[in-house]
């Protein structure tokens, strides 16, 4: 089987991570793969905010928990130490789709490097808040951006789950 197809079929969402931060080289490889995602009209209208600062990571987790309505003490990032936030340029008509493809590439690249990942939502709501718009400005990011998702990344603690059987009736051929 082709390596890429095998990676697509064996990647799983991971919900239990070790606290150890992945090596910067590993994160850079994952990010690079994300930047090579297909995008509409070659605009490359998505960016990645790589969060490895524990204080900011924990602040994002707390806000994500609040937005999601989760109980106190729950970490919606499942203990993953690194958070790669994908944002789309609001002026780019394909930005949301482009950002979604970036997310897919990030998760596949993490899997290829034997790291775990999972897509966590609520980035849109986070980056609608003034303090996170200001964070982007402080980092030198100009323009209006919409949060697409958090790709949380780390070393897997335990075994990856087995894939659920694929449901029938999801492909329709027009021959």
Range-by-range predicted roles:
Residues 1-175:
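Acidic, surface-exposed loops and disordered segments
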